[in-house]
């Protein structure tokens, strides 16, 4: 889903430039040349995002090779290195051919980065994918904000779990994610949906991969806790986590122990 979101954003951008240039009868050759900045996490924090950027490079080429995609990554510990995150994003505006910057996921600091980009280069379009900052806030600087339909997903995920025969839904997250308005609202919807379908809703907490324990520590916690959770809640339980780094160890243990 994330790969598709990034790809659609850039395809939309490319088409818009083609039509814009086609409308100019006497357009200079240089007007057809533009670059697109793609900002993602690293493979350890959000592999899907990074692979999506690689797919775009494979299709449209990297700037260093004469293509249009300039891909950069923000730090794994982006919560503590917000200034670095901002600098990485804003640095893309130094390229005179840069016409759009897509940040996916739009982690904290993206709003400020877009503000600085607009100050120095108002011609650059700023796109935010899966915003970690409140949408009304990031919308003040972004030209387009794209998020999953978290309202519908809150209901549909529970309904699907019910249709699969689950009697318990275990939601795994941590305080940083739960502070996001989109995620807290989705949890409220999930709770209401569980009530509707007669399911038990459980909140479990796991370490934040951006904290001192890092990705490895967070994943180890999931590996160790899942067997106990399955024993506690039963094999008819559905498990859901809000962080990419938690997903792989969670799936691994569910395949081994059930659930």
Predicted segments with their positions:
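Flexible loop/hinge segments that line or gate small-molecule binding clefts
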Residues: 117-151
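Loop/turn elements at helix/coil->beta-strand transitions in domains of secreted/extracellular proteins
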Residues: 32-34, 65, 96-100, 120-125, ...
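Short beta-strand elements in bilobed, periplasmic/extracellular small-molecule ligand-binding domains
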Residues: 60-81, 170, 191-215
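Short, low-complexity disordered leader/linker segments with a strong preference
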Residues: 1-34
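Hydrophobic alpha-helical
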Residues: 100-126, 190, 210-259
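Solvent-exposed loop/turn segments at secondary-structure junctions
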Residues: 42-45, 106-110, 131-136, 175-179, ...
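An alpha-beta-alpha
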Residues: 53, 150-204
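Extracytoplasmic "Venus flytrap"
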Residues: 32-86, 102-108
């Amino acid at each position: 889903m994330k790969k598709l979101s990034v790809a659609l954003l850039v395809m939309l951008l490319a088409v818009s430039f083609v039509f814009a240039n086609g409308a100019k009868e006497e357009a200079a050759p240089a007007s057809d040349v533009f670059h697109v900045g793609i900002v993602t996490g690293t493979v350890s924090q959000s592999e899907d995002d990074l692979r999506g950027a690689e797919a775009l490079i494979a299709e449209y080429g990297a700037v260093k090779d004469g293509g249009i995609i300039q891909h950069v990554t923000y730090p794994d510990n982006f919560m503590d290195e917000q200034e670095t995150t901002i600098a990485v994003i804003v640095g893309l505006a130094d390229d005179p051919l840069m016409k759009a910057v897509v940040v996916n996921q739009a982690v904290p600091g993206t709003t400020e980065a877009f503000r600085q980009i607009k100050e120095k280069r108002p011609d650059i379009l700023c796109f935010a994918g899966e915003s970690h900052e409140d949408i009304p806030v990031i919308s003040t600087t972004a030209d387009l904000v794209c998020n999953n339909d978290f309202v519908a997903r809150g209901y549909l995920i529970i309904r699907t779990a019910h249709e699969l025969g689950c009697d318990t839904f275990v939601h795994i997250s941590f305080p940083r994610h739960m502070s996001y308005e989109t995620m807290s609202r989705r949890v409220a919807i999930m709770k209401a949906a569980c009530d509707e379908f007669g399911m038990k809703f459980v909140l479990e907490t796991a370490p934040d991969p951006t904290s001192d324990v890092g990705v490895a520590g967070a994943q180890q916690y999931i590996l160790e806790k899942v067997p106990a959770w399955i024993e506690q809640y039963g094999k008819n339980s559905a498990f859901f986590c809000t962080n990419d780094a938690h997903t792989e160890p969670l799936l691994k243990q569910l395949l081994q122990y059930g659930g």
